């Protein structure tokens, strides 16, 4: 059971006052009056019943019925019977008990659910929100129960309302019955079969007047024949009447004035090349006023066309009178009806207009037939399309139908009738109608021949207006001269030839505008052919086929065939454009022609380079950013249009990796640009790491275009190789952080040498095969000496590197010479310099270092990641530099040099020790010390410590080498002392334990270069166990120190025994007494001193040997006394 709201229950009470059929709101009195007017009875319990607005008897009505207590009754066979009861409505009425039960259950359910929810949310919600929720529920229930209360109050009077609902329903049904009765009565008037025909008033009048009816005879009554005289008389009268009528007509059409003839009772109008028509009149009335024309109009007699199809030529001809076209019978009858109607309404003016249009339309029909024939059986097959619109008297001819420019009716010719009703044409192309085309008299064969032979004048740049075909006027159609046969083929030839010529003119103008400095690139051979210069030595003929509209090359190559295909296909850049214009096509054609010129010129250069031994690399593709690096060298040359510039990369077999010759060919001219570049692939992209434009001789640079002959390509490899070698040398100088000035010309290099007062020594020992071989290349680079190459005090701030390339036995050799000033050389070092195999002229303060590099082997070695060409010569320079510095320092410190070579120097330490060998650094290496096989282990250990120190030092200065040498002189007495102690122990230490182990052992420990420990191990056995060996250690430390109070710069030795002062060594008290006693007995008569500082002693290095021997003897004495 669905829930009803109080509003739903009250709806029936409102419907009591709503009339459903008319949708009008009625009050209670109106409803009562309607009841009284439409029912057979009166309203019950009314004292004043109403009938048609007037009071009536309460026991009777105006229809003869009676009402009693609201219930109708009638008499049947004299018996009074009750009318049927009004039907009771029970639909959509719900018992009140059901509503009360539902609301009670719903209220109980909502209260129960709310109480359960509130009990479960006691901990999660505060009391105020829970109370508010419960209050809202009670308020909503209260509102529902108020509605229930209202419903109960309303139900107390529900019986009366139910009667009103039944009464309203009965009213509606009675209203429906009365409407149906009205419709039925109205249908009685439409019974046509029951109607009588109208009276024949006309026949009645005729009988009344003539006393007989006028009935047709149906040719049953024969008519007498008309005599010839009567006929001639009538025709003569008609001729006279027609002459008079024609003389009195003021608005006779212009072309009818002198082109008519009156004979045989009719007027013959003959319009040359179009038609002939004859008309007459039905009586002899003379019409003087136009308003009286209807009294005697003209009637149509005969018609024929004065043109037709010539069976010999299949063309439309006018000149042969025998070739006329008569209409079929059905067409003639149809035309007769139309012409008579036109003559009645519009007279002769309307006749001319009608027949002129008819003739032109028939010409168009014949043209359409001719078009259909030539589109199938001629050269125009598959090249034209046409539409014949008969209703508009219009023919559309789409020429070049296979060409994308004209496909889908983008270029066509309209053949139709202009505003003077003459046969004319319009030309639609490039999205608009072409009005200034310069073609006239297209339907005159003589004019067509003249135009096909004559060239058109220059076209005016006037945009055509969108006009209808009827607004066009051609002067030639006003000419009444007899035209020749009309040929659609010739008309199409005129149009397509004109269009082709206009396209070629546009292409030529665009090319000349684009290549303004290349006038010889394009020239006309004929109006449909252009001569294009693709390379300095090759040209091609570019033409258009007027029949199809396609372009082609004469005697094309494969690449030209590809370009032809692109030209005759719509460009992909314009496929999404809503309209593809002629300018777009011309732009695409010019772009393709310039691209062809670019490809052909590039191919010619590519063939010459490959023939010369170059290898083309097609893998390298530069992005825009890298390409700009090349354009920076062009100094204003047009390099922006990358679509018409092509860059190719080449290399020679003997070149290093990543080096390429870059060639740029411009499509706008015949200029070429050349670079040498190093290009590498980094993360999938090609990057230019270095680039330099090639500079040719002065004659080539002054001309706009290089002469690409055999001499050019023969010298190109050498020029590029020289540039690569130069860059590799300069890059190597940069890597070594040597500053330089770029290579100098011979004249400028000579000036620099004179400025620095350097006289270059001529080469000696030149091989005979070199004298007859010219130098391939020679340059001089000035190096900046910042005291790293050579000491400035011994040289100058500038050195010179001379590079000379020669070719011997098919291999390229590079001769390097490094030279400059060299002065202030110590006299004692002259022999040392001679041992370095360097050419030094002390008298001229000059030196030079020579080296030879075989480039064929050097740069072709792919395993070498970075080719180093200057390693050898810079190594010699570095050796010379270090040697000068070291020898100068050794000479200043009076250090004796025993021997020297190109990579090492032997220094004398003292008379007893071995010589110290110092290895000079090579390139980025550092100084190192070399030990001989006869050195002691202690000396080898010291040398290893020193080499480690030198390797960890970022930069070793020459004074540090002097310090190392001085350290060796200071450490040598200690090394000798170690040897003496070992010798003493070997000689005097004879005491052994029971197991044969020596009671006294000695060892030396180097903690670092400044701390040396003399360790004495005392071995003894345990008292409880003779097998267990115990070992005690006595450590004597030696380290260098400086006496700050002594002005002499000499090192002293500090002897320390503090580490032995512990409780474990109390048993060795006697030993320490013996040690101190031995120290005090050391001889100091030679001026050396021993200074005691508590448990430490400061000793001169000269006394260390004797001191340590005394201490060792103390150990031996102590052990012997305890034995």
Curated annotation (Swiss-Prot):
Transmembrane segments: none annotated. It is found in: Nucleus. Residues 450-484 are annotated as: Disordered. Its main location: nucleus. GO terms for cellular component: core mediator complex; mediator complex. GO terms for molecular function: transcription coregulator activity. The keyword Cell inner membrane does not apply. Keywords: Activator, Nucleus, Transcription, Transcription regulation. Pfam families: Med14. GO terms for biological process: regulation of transcription by RNA polymerase II. The keyword Phosphoprotein does not apply. Belongs to the Mediator complex subunit 14 family. Component of the Mediator complex. Component of the Mediator complex, a coactivator involved in the regulated transcription of nearly all RNA polymerase II-dependent genes. Mediator functions as a bridge to convey information from gene-specific regulatory proteins to the basal RNA polymerase II transcription machinery. Mediator is recruited to promoters by direct interactions with regulatory proteins and serves as a scaffold for the assembly of a functional preinitiation complex with RNA polymerase II and the general transcription factors. This is Mediator of RNA polymerase II transcription subunit 14. It comes from Debaryomyces hansenii (strain ATCC 36239 / CBS 767 / BCRC 21394 / JCM 1990 / NBRC 0083 / IGC 2968) (Yeast). The gene is RGR1.
């Amino acid at each position: 059971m669905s829930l009803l709201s109080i509003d739903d229950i009250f709806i029936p009470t409102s419907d009591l006052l709503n009339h459903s059929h008319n949708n009008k709101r009625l009050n209670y009195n109106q409803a009562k009056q309607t009841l009284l007017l439409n029912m057979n009875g009166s309203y019950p319990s009314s004292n004043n019943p109403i009938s048609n607005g007037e009071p009536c008897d309460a026991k009777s009505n105006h229809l003869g019925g009676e009402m009693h207590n609201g219930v109708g009754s009638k008499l049947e066979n004299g018996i009074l019977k009750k009318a049927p009861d009004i039907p009771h409505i029970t639909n959509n009425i719900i018992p009140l008990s059901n509503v009360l039960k539902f609301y009670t259950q719903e209220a109980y359910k909502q209260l129960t659910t709310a109480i359960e929810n509130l009990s479960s949310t006691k901990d999660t919600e505060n009391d105020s929100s829970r109370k508010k929720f419960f209050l809202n529920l009670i308020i909503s229930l209260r509102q529902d129960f108020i509605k229930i209360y209202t419903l109960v109050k309303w139900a107390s009077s529900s019986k009366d309302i139910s009667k009103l609902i039944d009464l309203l329903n009965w009213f509606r049904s009675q209203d429906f019955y009365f409407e149906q009765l009205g419709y039925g009565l109205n249908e009685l008037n439409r019974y046509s079969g029951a109607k009588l025909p109208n009276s024949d008033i006309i026949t009645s009048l005729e009988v009344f007047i003539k006393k007989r009816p006028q009935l047709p005879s149906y040719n049953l009554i024969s008519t007498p024949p008309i005599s010839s005289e009567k006929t001639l008389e009538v025709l003569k009268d008609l001729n006279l009447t027609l002459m008079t009528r024609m003389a009195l007509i003021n608005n006779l059409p212009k072309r009818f004035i002198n082109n008519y003839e009156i004979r045989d009772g009719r007027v013959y109008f003959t319009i040359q090349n179009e038609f002939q028509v004859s008309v007459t009149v039905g009586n002899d009335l003379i019409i003087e006023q136009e308003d009286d024309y209807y009294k005697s109009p003209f009637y149509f007699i005969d018609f024929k066309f004065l043109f037709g199809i010539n069976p010999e030529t299949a063309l439309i001809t006018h000149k042969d009178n025998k070739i006329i076209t008569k209409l079929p019978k059905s067409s003639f009858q149809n035309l007769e009806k139309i012409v008579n109607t036109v003559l009645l309404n519009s007279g002769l003016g309307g006749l001319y207009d009608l027949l002129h249009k008819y003739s032109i339309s028939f010409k168009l029909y014949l043209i359409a037939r001719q078009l259909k024939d030539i589109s199938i059986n001629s050269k125009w097959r598959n090249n034209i399309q046409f539409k014949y619109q008969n209703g508009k008297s219009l023919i559309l001819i789409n020429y070049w139908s296979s060409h994308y420019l004209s496909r889908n009716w983008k270029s066509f010719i309209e053949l139709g009738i202009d505003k003077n009703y003459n046969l004319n044409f319009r030309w639609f192309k490039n999205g608009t109608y072409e009005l200034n085309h310069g073609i006239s008299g297209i339907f005159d064969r003589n004019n067509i021949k003249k135009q096909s032979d004559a060239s058109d004048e220059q076209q005016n740049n006037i945009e055509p207006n969108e006009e209808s075909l009827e607004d066009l006027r051609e002067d030639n159609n006003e000419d009444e001269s007899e035209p020749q046969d009309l040929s659609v083929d010739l008309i199409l030839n005129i149009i397509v030839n004109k269009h082709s010529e206009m396209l070629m003119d546009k292409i030529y103008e665009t090319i000349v505008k684009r290549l303004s400095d290349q006038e010889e690139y394009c020239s006309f051979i004929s109006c449909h052919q252009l001569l294009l210069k693709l390379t300095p030595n090759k040209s091609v003929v570019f033409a258009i086929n007027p029949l199809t509209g396609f372009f082609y090359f004469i005697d094309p190559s494969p690449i030209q065939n590809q370009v032809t295909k692109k030209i005759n296909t719509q460009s992909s850049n314009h496929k999404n454009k809503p309209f593809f214009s002629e300018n777009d096509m011309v732009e695409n054609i010019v772009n393709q022609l310039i691209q062809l010129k670019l490809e052909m010129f590039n191919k010619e250069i590519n063939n010459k380079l490959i023939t010369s031994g170059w290898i083309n690399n097609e893998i390298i593709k530069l992005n825009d950013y890298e390409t700009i690096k090349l354009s920076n060298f062009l100094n204003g040359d047009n390099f922006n249009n990358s679509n018409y510039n092509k860059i190719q990369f080449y290399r020679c077999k003997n070149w290093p990796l990543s080096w390429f010759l870059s060639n740029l060919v411009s499509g706008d001219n015949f200029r070429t640009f050349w670079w040498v570049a190093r290009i590498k692939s980094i993360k999938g992209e090609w990057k230019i790491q270095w680039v330099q434009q090639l500079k040719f001789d002065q004659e080539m640079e002054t001309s706009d275009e290089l002469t690409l002959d055999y001499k050019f390509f023969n010298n190109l490899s050498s020029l590029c190789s020289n540039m690569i070698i130069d860059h590799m040398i300069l890059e190597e100088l940069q890597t070594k952080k040597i500053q330089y000035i770029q290579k100098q010309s011979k004249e400028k290099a000579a000036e620099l040498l004179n400025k620095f007062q350097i006289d270059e020594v001529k080469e000696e020992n030149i091989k005979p095969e070199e004298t007859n071989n010219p130098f391939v290349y020679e340059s001089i680079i000035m190096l900046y000496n910042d005291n790293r190459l050579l000491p400035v005090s011994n040289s100058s701030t500038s050195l010179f590197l001379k590079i000379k390339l020669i070719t011997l036995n098919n291999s390229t050799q590079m001769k390097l010479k490094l030279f400059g000033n060299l002065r202030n050389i110590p006299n004692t070092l002259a022999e040392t310099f001679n041992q370095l195999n360097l050419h030094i002229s002390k008298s001229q303060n000059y030196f030079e270092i020579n080296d030879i590099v075989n480039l064929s082997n050097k740069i072709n070695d792919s395993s070498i990641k970075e080719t180093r060409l200057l390693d050898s010569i810079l190594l010699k320079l570095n050796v010379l530099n270090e040697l000068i510095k070291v020898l100068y320092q050794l000479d200043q410190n009076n250090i004796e040099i025993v021997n020297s070579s190109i990579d090492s120097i032997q220094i004398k330490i003292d008379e007893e020790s071995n010589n110290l060998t110092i290895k000079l650094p090579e390139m980025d290496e550092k100084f190192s010390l070399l030990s001989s096989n006869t050195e002691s282990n202690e000396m080898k250990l010291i040398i290893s410590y020193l080499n480690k120190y030198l390797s960890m030092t970022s930069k070793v200065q020459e004074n540090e080498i002097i310090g190392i040498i001085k350290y060796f002189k200071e450490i040598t007495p200690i090394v000798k002392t170690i040897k003496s102690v070992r010798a003493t122990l070997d000689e005097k230490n004879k005491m052994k334990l029971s197991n044969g182990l020596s009671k006294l052992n000695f060892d030396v420990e180097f903690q670092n270069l400044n701390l040396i420990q003399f360790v004495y191990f005392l071995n003894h056995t345990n008292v409880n166990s003779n097998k267990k060996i115990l070992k005690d250690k006595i450590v004597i430390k030696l380290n260098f120190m400086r006496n700050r109070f002594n002005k002499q710069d000499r090192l002293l030795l500090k002897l320390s025994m503090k580490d032995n002062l512990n409780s474990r060594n109390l048993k060795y008290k006697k030993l320490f007494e013996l040690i101190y006693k031995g120290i005090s007995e050391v001889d100091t008569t030679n001026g050396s001193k021993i200074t005691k500082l508590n448990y430490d002693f400061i000793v001169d290095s000269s006394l260390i040997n004797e001191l340590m021997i005394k201490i060792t003897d103390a150990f031996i004495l102590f052990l012997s006394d305890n034995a």
